[in-house]
């Protein structure tokens, strides 16, 4: 039971300080992509997150690689920066792909 409690406490810190971690992700985005906007969305923004929730982060850049492999490399750098076990779901998109998200996501918080 102590292990579960430790995991819950560890994840709770990410939710309490999600903006700080999103700023870390943004630092990597700027370094790798030069021009990037970072948004948080989903249950954490809506105040509806649960212990099983993740924190959705959307990185938008006109310099986003087309290759999914290159995007995966950037995502890996971001996760290493915040902690691989961090409960972040990082979405990497170009401005055109961002328009698709805007159709479905009601609320974004720009970092």
Residue ranges and their predicted role:
Residues 1-39, 45-52, 62-111:
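Catalytic core of pol beta-like nucleotidyltransferases
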